[in-house]
Amino acid sequence: MAKHERGLRFQPTGGVKSVQIPAGKKQRLSIERLSDDGRGIAFLEGKTWFVAGSLAGEEVEARVLNARGKVVEARTERVFVASDLRRAPACDYFGRCGGCSVQHVPHEEQLALKQRMLAEQLLRVANVVPDEWAAPLSGAELAYRRRARVAVRWDAKAKRLDVGFRAAASQDIVSIEECPVLVQALQPIMSQLPAMLKSFSKPQVLGHVELFSGSSTAVLLRHTAPLAEADLATLQAFCKTHGAQLWLHGEGEPQPASPGDTLGYRLEPWNLQLAWRPGDFIQVNAAVNTAMIEQALHWLAPAADERVMDLFCGLGNFALPLASLAKDVVAVEGVATMVERAAVNAMSNDLHNVRFFQADLSQPLTHADWAAEGFSAVLLDPPRDGAFEVVRQIRKTGAQRLLYVSCNPATLARDTVELVKQGYRLKRAGILDMFPQTAHVEAMALFEVSK
């Protein structure tokens, strides 16, 4: 029997395992195209590289973040040959902070990339092309984000408090003092927040911080133990200087430091005020949110004698504007506390033709009395998992028109397959640029019963 070659291991199946590339290794690569998430794709020695911060046609030096099998994730460290499309990022932390991934791409090209991603998913998964493509719905490139979560961590070994945002593909914190995508009201708070927190006598009890801007500005601090009196006074003075409410989140639910303080946002075209609390979902881009609602109402076009169902209604972001047009709105949400707040929002805005119900929308609708009432139109705004169980039964509602707002083109495409089976046709679709400078795609699609 022949001796084994030194260093060679025989595998039961599949031949010799490929050599894994260590994290931190640098490699020169030729970028061939962009992936669905905006990263450059390169091929080398049988492996596919996904390179953040690169563009098609570029020659770059990339640093490996992690490697698994034949897939390598990396980030651009140096550009040898740049694409004509490349632009200087607006943020000094770009490439280190995990918040924005495509600041090096012109905004018009960002929109085109997102539109292509949506079109490819619909065609590949559902074999569908909409009758009409809508123009991308977009707003300002920067200073759009009205809500942010700031990471805070005490490094006991280094005796250092880190304040900032999570690094790309990591739990590390990138220390940040400015963020150009935050709305203007939050930028001075963000710039002075790290120094204020680092002055605390007991920084080890600090958790994350959340910043909000709406009808009022607010700072929420998560803490794992009671704050020292001096530290609380420092925090209160900081918030007073910036005209912000202070919310504290220790044990139990977050509470305002000043009883009676509330959070909310306005939907000006409909003269609506929506109240919410920390932990509730709201859209972070106020301008695109308003434009999205306007487009949804225009596409769905509910008549004054029609009944509309709003599924995954949240705080009433769509349901309350819909109530100004339709005869009757039935709005359904899975989170009981948000159903309660949505109902309060309807009453406080003097809307009496909208009813709210709590239901598990990951399950079919067949057993709900409100689902059997009959509707002319349905609006869906599900989470990333989509609404597969709902759309399987949607034709039983009698809806002739269905408007689907999606935060995940993959599940929209999957659900489109089922809607086509149910007898609907995709009439119109387009992207919603809710998160400029990122590859995150939101979309709107209008379905109508096939004639």
Curated annotation (Swiss-Prot):
TRAM domain sequence ranges: 20-78
Region (Disordered): 1-21
Annotated Pfam families: TRAM (PF01938), tRNA_U5-meth_tr (PF05958)
Catalytically driven reaction(s): uridine(1939) in 23S rRNA + S-adenosyl-L-methionine = 5-methyluridine(1939) in 23S rRNA + S-adenosyl-L-homocysteine + H(+)
Disulfide bonds: none
Single GO molecular function: iron ion binding
Residues engaged in binding S-adenosyl-L-methionine: Q283, F312, N317, E333, D360, D381
Keyword list, A-Z: 4Fe-4S, Iron, Iron-sulfur, Metal-binding, Methyltransferase, rRNA processing, S-adenosyl-L-methionine, Transferase
Biological process terms in GO annotation: rRNA base methylation
PROSITE patterns: SAM_MT_RNA_M5U, TRAM, TRMA_1, TRMA_2
Listed InterPro entries: 23S_rRNA_MeTrfase_RlmD, MeTrfase_TrmA_AS, MeTrfase_TrmA_CS, NA-bd_OB-fold, SAM-dependent_MTases_sf, TRAM_dom, U5_MeTrfase_fam
Residues noted as binding [4Fe-4S] cluster in the record, renumbered to the chain: C91, C97, C100, C179
EC number(s) on file: 2.1.1.190
Classification via SUPFAM superfamilies: Nucleic acid-binding proteins (SSF50249), S-adenosyl-L-methionine-dependent methyltransferases (SSF53335)
Family from the record: Belongs to the class I-like SAM-binding methyltransferase superfamily. RNA M5U methyltransferase family. RlmD subfamily.
Function comment: Catalyzes the formation of 5-methyl-uridine at position 1939 (m5U1939) in 23S rRNA.
Protein name as it appears in the record: 23S rRNA (uracil(1939)-C(5))-methyltransferase RlmD
Organism: Pseudomonas syringae pv. tomato (strain ATCC BAA-871 / DC3000)
Phylogenetic lineage: Bacteria, Pseudomonadati, Pseudomonadota, Gammaproteobacteria, Pseudomonadales
Gene: rlmD
